[in-house]
Every structure is written in C-alpha cells, then in structure tokens.
A protein has these predicted regions:
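Intrinsic, short, N-terminal disordered tails of RNA polymerase sigma-factor systems
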Residues: 1-51, 124-138, 146-158, 174, ...
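Helix-turn-helix DNA-binding motif, specifically the short coil turn and the N-cap/start of the second
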Residues: 66, 172, 181-186
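Arg/Lys-rich amphipathic alpha helix in sigma70-family domain 2
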Residues: 99-120, 141
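A short pre-motif secondary-structure segment
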Residues: 162-166
Length: 210
C-alpha cells in the first residue's frame, strides 16, 4: 500500500526564509532604531512564531485558494500577531497564530465575497463511526493528489478549514474549537460532515468508496 499522502501547500525553505525576512523587515521598519527591549521582544517573537509559518500558510492557502492572497494574509497575520505579542502568555503559539490567520483570511473572504462562508448542513448529527476514519483513509495515495485538491476546493470554506486543522496540522479538538470559536461537539460533527463530503466526491470520481 502506498504511503498516506499529506496534501498541503507548504512553503519551501526559500519561500519560508523570504517571507520571514519580509515580516521581520516590516516590523523593524516600525522601529527605526529598536532599543534593547524591542530587540528582545522581536527575538522572542521570532523564536515562538516563525516556526509555525508553514502551518499559517497552509491554512491560508486552503481557505483562500489563491497563493498571492495566502502570502499577503500570512504577512498581515504575522504583523498583527507581533502587535499583540506582548499580550500572549500561553504555551500554544501555533494555535494562537492560526486563530489570527483564520480571522485575517475570513476578513479577506468577506471583503471579496468570494465564497459562501456558512455551511448549508445541520451541525447536530450523530458522529459515531465517523471518528474511525483516519487521515490515511481520506488522504490516501499520491496518485490522487490532484483529485483530492479538487475535492477540497468543492467544499465550503469551513469544511476545508476543519480538515486542514485536523488532518494537515494534527490539532486536537480543543485547539480547533479555540481557533474556530465553536464548541468541541460542533468540531466533531462538522469534521464528520467534512469527511463525508470529501469521501462522497472521491467515490464519485474514482469509482469506489474510500
């Protein structure tokens, strides 16, 4: 059996370094001659937040479905994160950053009115049996990479988002609930719906159930 496929839009190392430099340059530009305290804050911010730039880009890309918009959103989100960094006292920098990326992405989506941001399905459903569906079942083989991307593109933004957070980034239900600002039970039901719709699309286009 082929290895499970991790479908994402990850930056390569060169892109990551370039975007990190842009973020750092923009921040430094706001502090023409940063003092020791500002330099310490920037160093702490870089250490805590820059390792999550790939995850930030991945989420923005799936939500926006546009590379240029995704990069703009990531940079804007990092600048917002830096402005608020003095108030960050938690231990989960990735979840905190992804919350900002999510909010920034939805602000752009609403501005462009590019998609219907709400799902058309009832959230309160039974989820027994769905949780046994693993990422390997949904994102199965590399030869189906393009088809999986097409299937994801057909989903509402909220479904793309929850699949990305759970199966691409491996976040817990609690982390996803915090990021999406919904109850954990809604996370489970929405994830079950998203998996089901993804499997339906794949079954229809590949000709067999996943």
């Amino acid at each position: 059996m082929a290895a499970p496929l991790k479908i994402d839009y990850a930056f390569n190392a060169e892109d990551l370094e370039s975007s990190a430099k842009i973020v750092k340059f923009t921040i430094l530009k706001k502090h023409q001659e940063p003092d020791a305290a500002q330099e310490h804050e920037l160093a702490s911010f870089e250490e805590t937040m820059l390792p999550h730039m790939d995850a930030a880009h991945n989420l923005a890309k799936w939500l926006l479905r546009n590379e240029e918009d995704a990069q703009d959103v990531v940079q804007e989100a990092y600048l917002r994160a830096f402005k608020s960094f003095s108030g960050f006292h938690g231990s989960n920098g990735r979840a905190w950053l992804l919350t900002i990326v999510r909010n920034t992405s939805y602000t752009l989506l609403k501005k462009n009115r590019a998609v219907d941001l709400t799902t058309t399905f009832e959230e309160e459903i039974h989820t027994s049996g769905h949780e046994s569906v693993s990422p390997a079942t949904i994102l199965e083989h590399s030869e189906n990479a393009e088809l999986i991307k097409e299937a994801m593109d057909e989903l509402p933004a909220e479904f793309r988002e929850i699949l990305t957070l759970r199966h691409q980034e491996g976040l817990s239900y609690k982390e996803i609930a915090d990021i999406m600002q919904i109850p954990a039970g809604t996370v489970m039901s929405r994830l079950a719906r998203a998996r089901g719709k993804l499997k339906e699309y794949l079954a229809a286009h590949i000709g067999k159930e996943r």
